[in-house]
Amino acid sequence: PPVPQQVVVWIVRFVVGISCYVSRSNWKRGIMAAVFAMLITLVTSQLGMTIRFGILHMFAFAILLWWLIDTVCRHKKLRTAVVSLVLGIAIIAIDYGFSSAYENGMRFTTDKTWFFVADWLNAGVSSSDYYPIFPSVGYVLIGSFFGYLLYNKRRSLFPRLGRYSWHAPFDFWGRIALWV
């Protein structure tokens, strides 16, 4: 993919991670994203351009994983943030290691069942939109750590500038993003 697209996708994954930290309803958001992801798979498979594990699937997985980490850490924000950072770095490092091995001729499987985990396991599966767990979820988890650093006091970093403030278009698109 082109570099600008990669940058935008990286930023979006990072912001989803920040949103995980800020949100009070990650279980609900994750389930809702998973349902929409399954609907997208169903519709696109009928159209002949199947999306098997796209960005929305990955977001659903990442949000639910963050919810699980937060639950296991008993909603202790610092503990959750540190575990998320360590796991995020580990996911990216593992992907880097296995991707390097794959590029050097090592093949891990021909079983197409595990394609959603990582590029190095996709065994030739094609998808119209493809964001595997490794490394994508790692960036989301690291974003949640930065959510802790930036929003620990739960105060916006952006000023309110009146009723018709500069962020109104972003507020609107943020509210309807899942539907778009």
Where are these regions (language model features)?
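Alpha-helical transmembrane segments and their immediate juxtamembrane cytosolic regions
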Residues: P1-V180
